């Protein structure tokens, strides 16, 4: 397993801070001709993740002369939102070594600010941090052809990724689609869907007859109950059978039989799509109507439904769908109510549930694991920050990458750059390299080479800003 980016970059900061005078130490004579007015923060222009380097911070007066005897308290910040910074420092004799950890490859700066007088501040020049090949992190890749959030991204048998639908910054629901090619890192347009769709499902039909193998089933996200199939052999969408119920923010799960279970989406109804006939048929109802829930295929072929909400109230309940009987039955409840959360099947057959909006309308930092053997949920160590409407992706080494999400209430309605890794062996989350761009309602798709493609999402809600950028977790 690679070393998490959170352990990446150690910066030794040696601070030459001096001024004179009494009180806060920000005024008086000493070696300068007046009190300190700003800091000069000098840093190298380039660095490699994991390679230590030094910066110099000097307290200067308005004539840019060093102010000796400075005794104020300095607060350090960084443009790297995931940086691990030292506590506020009182610098004895104007000089002290400071250790800082930057987590994110890319361009970062470090800022020194006097606590008592915040106008006394200084920012380093940009530090271009290259990714260490032995470390995890995100890197930008080609942008999509247009903005998308609440869309889908589906790995195809040929290794490309079908990105479809969603909404843009103007509130337009989209019918357009495009393909990401990992070999070139670029997106190209493909045929458009018959209907525009948002918060819908896209399911690769991998186990059906030859006529449907490799096709992708698109269901829901419209005012009516339509469905269509994408054929990667010719890049076109064609209509298929009519679903029993319209669905929005529902789930779709490929079963071992090759059929697809569609459940929830502002309803308690459920139905099955049969690729052999192209028809939908009703199956047993869920115990509770729910949307923004999760559906996870378990090792025994049953499907675990967790959480969700109805009438703006999040649930902690869970239920199991048995394909052999076509019925849903209650199982153990989660330790916390959740909607807009994630559920990821682990290699040990258990299910990791993370984040979401809880019953207090807060973004949750908690996580728990469902054990199919006992039908119960148990808590694990919390995440380092809250995540909702985020992504959680099982990596080749068995860890789970949790990325992005909704930040509330500070600032309200903005995306997060936060990312962390869950290790099932220790049941602990560790920070990893942060996203290059804050986002939620995005997608994460694990590619055949083990990398994870992140596409689109919403950057903020006021004003609405939808993204067309994409990045790769390596």
Question: What annotation goes with each model-predicted range?
Answer:
Residues 1-9:
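Bacterial N-terminal signal peptides that target proteins for export
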Residues 1, 34-36, 474:
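N-terminal low-hydrophobic presequence detector
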Residues 21-133, 173:
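Core sequence-specific DNA-binding domains of diverse transcription factors
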Residues 131-474:
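Kelch-like beta-propeller repeat domains
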Residues 12:
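Flanking scaffold residues of small Cys/His-coordinated metal-binding clusters
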